A protein has these predicted regions:
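Basic nucleic-acid-binding interfaces
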Residues: 1-157
Length: 157
């Protein structure tokens, strides 16, 4: 069998997922002390559930994680636990954030999840380079080719 397989009592498994989720209102809050604190909280909660983090990146307005989730946990139940418990822990550590987010919910409702097969290396590289790609996309969006109000082509200065 392959070395990246895991096993439980009577099960051998290799369940890897690429997960992306964002703070409520997609606020750009994940930087500096918040970034380090949120990273510690997410690692702690994953360890408690036996979820292995292969790669992770905290961008200012979203989180990318490549994780192995045991088959005894469903993705939806694990993510409900991760987002719910981490919200409470984030608000305990950073009480000032309670005023920006109502109802003690730090994360938005949805998430993106994709299974990972033979393309694991490519996804790990994508996650590692995510911050650079966000900066490039922001720079590209500074100049719009067409005026959003008139629809006419803008002239570069």
């Amino acid at each position: 069998m392959r070395q990246d397989n895991n096993s439980l009592a009577h099960t051998t498994w290799n369940c890897k997922y690429h997960i992306v989720f964002a703070p409520k209102y997609r606020r750009q809050i994940i930087y500096g002390k918040y970034k380090a604190s949120i990273g510690q909280i997410l690692r702690l909660l994953c360890e408690r559930n036996g979820v292995e983090i292969h790669e992770a990146e905290a961008c200012p307005d979203h989180i990318h994680m490549l994780v192995s989730i045991p088959p005894k946990l469903s993705i939806s139940s694990f993510m409900g636990y991760l987002k719910g418990k981490s919200s409470l822990m984030i608000f305990d550590r950073h009480a000032n954030l309670k005023y920006k987010y109502g109802n003690r919910k730090f994360w938005c409702r949805g998430l993106y999840v994709d299974t990972v097969g033979r393309n694991q290396k490519r996804i790990e590289e994508y996650i590692r380079n995510q911050l650079q790609e966000d900066v490039i996309a922001d720079q590209l969006s500074l100049f719009e080719e067409y005026d959003p109000f008139t629809g006419e082509k803008n002239k570069r200065k």
